[in-house]
UniProtKB/Swiss-Prot annotation:
Record's catalysed reaction(s): an N-acylsphing-4-enine + 2 Fe(II)-[cytochrome b5] + O2 + 2 H(+) = an N-acyl-sphinga-4E,14Z-dienine + 2 Fe(III)-[cytochrome b5] + 2 H2O; N-(hexanoyl)sphing-4-enine + 2 Fe(II)-[cytochrome b5] + O2 + 2 H(+) = N-hexanoyl-sphinga-4E,14Z-dienine + 2 Fe(III)-[cytochrome b5] + 2 H2O; sphing-4-enine + 2 Fe(II)-[cytochrome b5] + O2 + 2 H(+) = sphinga-4E,14Z-dienine + 2 Fe(III)-[cytochrome b5] + 2 H2O; (11E)-octadecenoyl-CoA + 2 Fe(II)-[cytochrome b5] + O2 + 2 H(+) = (11E,13Z)-octadecadienoyl-CoA + 2 Fe(III)-[cytochrome b5] + 2 H2O
Pfam families in UniProt: Cyt-b5 (PF00173), FA_desaturase (PF00487)
Transit peptide listed as a keyword: no
Membrane topology field: Multi-pass membrane protein
Family listed: Belongs to the fatty acid desaturase type 1 family.
Protein name: Fatty acid desaturase 3
Lumenal side stretches: 152, 281-282, 326-443
Domain Cytochrome b5 heme-binding: 18-95
CDD domains, sorted: Delta6-FADS-like
Motif (Histidine box-1): 180-184
Gene3D superfamilies xref list: Cytochrome b5-like heme/steroid binding domain
GO CC terms: endoplasmic reticulum membrane
Amino acid sequence: MGGVGEPDWEPGQRGAPLPTLRWEQVRRHNLPGDKWLVIERRVYDISRWAQRHPGGSRLIGHHGAEDATDAFHAFHQDLSFVRKFLQPLLIGELAPEEPSQDGPQNTQLIEDFRALRQAVEDMKLFEAKPAFFGLLLGHILAMEVLAWLMIYMLGPGWVPSTLAALILAISQAQSWCLQHDLGHTSIFRNSRWNHLAQQFVMGQLKGFSAHWWNFRHFQHHAKPNIFHKDPDVTVAPVFLLGESSVEYGKKKRRYLPYNHQHLYFFLIGPPLLTLVNFEVENLAYMLVCMQWMDLLWAASFYARFLLSYIPFYGIPGALLLFVAVRVLESHWFVWITQMNHIPREIGHEKHRDWASSQLAATCNVEPSLFIDWFSGHLNFQIEHHLFPTMPRHNYRRVAPLVKALCAKHGLSYEVKPFLTALVDIIRSLKKSGNVWLEAYLHQ
């Protein structure tokens, strides 16, 4: 059909004109079993295929009834390959008089961002340096060996054990960073190699599931700081962030003393996230989703760790060392990953364009050789969120271009000192707690 209406066109009808659709029609298809999305003005019915989406049905479903063009480009390297999967899902295209994006969006910003992405591709900033990532893996393995040699040569006393725990925690933190690079397919050109290497780093070196991490982390990138779409900020009723503070206050919900959440954060946030929450969530995901290969990889980590340290400590001592390492790395994980997000805007879906949504949810931390290494280059969070598949050693080169784009459109490009970024987490929690208390008492 050539007019505007519900499509009756079949993908196999080569040469036939595509049905034309309006945004009003597209918006009606954003239900759990009925989802359409728009990529490059073409409309796709992903209702059935979403369950087969490699990134998970939730990830692609978060873009239901939206223009997902920039997300499509951001998450995929080989677009010609991915388009083969889209073709059978094609049901129409936007009518000529329809805008490319639904709702009040800055068309000029969208065009400028896409021009920036093309310029970045022309500069070959999506090409990785194998030696850089080889050194990262090498220094992780070296720390694992060094920690064991320290106990082997000096014995399991308090001083060697403390030093070994610190070294292992640093190794675990750097493993988080490396598997994060691999999960974003930013090292190898072939996505399969990235995923295989990620399973090794995440499974054998850390004891976690690569599929579990990608499931939750890709959602964070698709919709950062959006409740019920970004798992990292969907933390109520334990902590109240952003708009949830007023909502809980008005509804007189008081499961915890939220006006003191900036204090109990130190007790249950940094110490326990990796040790308790991640361990339980990770195991549940592997069992429920039947990720048996990930389970074997994770089991190989625990087998290696226990076999390495039980001869020196016995079973209780080896488990205590494991807990110490997990608690130390958990502190690193919480502070480093949240310093860029918790102090920023957190709330419900605003349906912004890609660049605006990422910039509203992120900020940077002043770079230095140490901070770049220590944070896994997550101090360049703005650049990472705009270009998630970009190898991190290129963030410094693209940063001035992103900053210029923000200046042109009056967008915030915030860069903080490292310690200020850490303190702002506590300030933000305290502010949200006070907002909750005010709403609880007076609204």
